[in-house]
């Protein structure tokens, strides 16, 4: 059982706020996770357990493989995102090791600090 001062971190996704196409199931599940986290935070507040959603942006890692989409689906995704004003070719992407410190920072917050949502994104070089 968790005690007062414990911290729950749920990892969300920028996809619920960015105009991607063809990701409706993923986007919906991440939006649901954020709503669940909000409700859980309210339920656990009196017990002193904190809940934070870390909404992550695009990241890469050398061990991560590219999506295995067929060519036509990949083209529809790219064209749909472009139509929605999202240029995937110019979007900055962070290395996964660059953002892990955010999780440590959330865990190390003083017990009197409440941080419900954090958004992590890449910046242009």
Where does each model-flagged region fall?
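Alpha-helical segment proximal to the catalytic Tyr-Lys
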Residues: 42-43
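Conserved SDR Rossmann-fold cofactor-binding beta-strand/turn motif
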Residues: 50-60
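Residue(s) in the substrate-gating loop at a strand-loop-helix junction
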Residues: 13
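Conserved catalytic-site region of short-chain dehydrogenase/reductase
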Residues: 16-18
